[in-house]
A protein has these predicted regions:
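Conserved P-loop NTPase
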Residues: 136-161
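P-loop NTPase switch/communication element
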Residues: 24-75
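Switch/connector loops and helix/strand junctions flanking conserved nucleotide-binding motifs
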Residues: 44-47, 118-121, 146-150
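Conserved P-loop NTPase nucleotide-binding/switch module
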Residues: 79-138, 143
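Well-ordered alpha-helical segments embedded in enzymatic catalytic cores
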Residues: 15-18, 68-74, 97
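P-loop NTPase nucleotide-binding module
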Residues: 1-40
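Peripheral, non-AAA+ core regions of ATP-driven protein-machinery
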Residues: 1-10, 14-17, 51, 119-128, ...
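Glycine- and other small-residue-rich loops at beta-strand/loop junctions that grip anionic moieties
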Residues: 5-8, 61-65, 86-88
Length: 161
């Protein structure tokens, strides 16, 4: 399970889209996996009439315009994904859906707004996820030199990798 963290406009959504595509397509060393993508605001897949306009991978099922919490539950029940990807966790109902994802055997790939791990830990939702050691890694993006730059990668305990 991986959480991408950055302030708005630093490349979380773009990096998430690229990761989804690469996980879905696979490569010569790693086989592709089925990915369930909840695209609540249409920023990831950019669907038009139900067809993704952005490349999110050949094994990716997209729920477009669906609330994150509902979408995660729907994907688990009906699409059998190996990986569930969502953008911008933050609401209490997202937390309950995240619990379902992690307890059903799926891998979670998500993003959250914040400047640092400490920043998002001010929210009880993320405090609980960290205490449960849900995320194996936290990837912090920033604006140093350019948007989308990886500033830090932390393990599930918040220690540098």
């Amino acid at each position: 399970h991986t959480l991408l963290i950055s302030p708005p406009g630093c490349g979380k959504t773009t990096l998430l889209r690229d990761m989804v595509r690469q996980i879905s397509n696979g490569n010569e060393k790693l086989p592709g996996m089925t990915v369930g993508l909840v695209d609540e605001r249409g920023e990831l897949a950019g669907c038009y009439q139900g067809v993704p306009q952005n490349d999110v991978g050949m094994r990716t099922d997209v729920l477009d315009g669906c609330p994150k919490a509902e979408g995660m539950q729907l994907l688990i029940r009906s699409m059998s994904p190996t990986v569930v990807a969502v953008d911008e966790l933050g609401k209490e109902e997202d937390f309950r859906a995240v619990e379902s994802v992690i307890h059903c055997g799926c891998t979670l790939l998500a993003t959250a707004h914040g400047n640092s791990l400490e920043d998002i830990m001010e929210q009880p939702f993320f405090q609980k996820l960290k205490s449960m050691q849900v995320f194996e890694r936290y990837i912090i993006l920033g604006r140093q030199k350019r948007n989308g730059r990886i500033v830090q990668i932390l393990d599930g305990k918040g220690k540098p990798c």
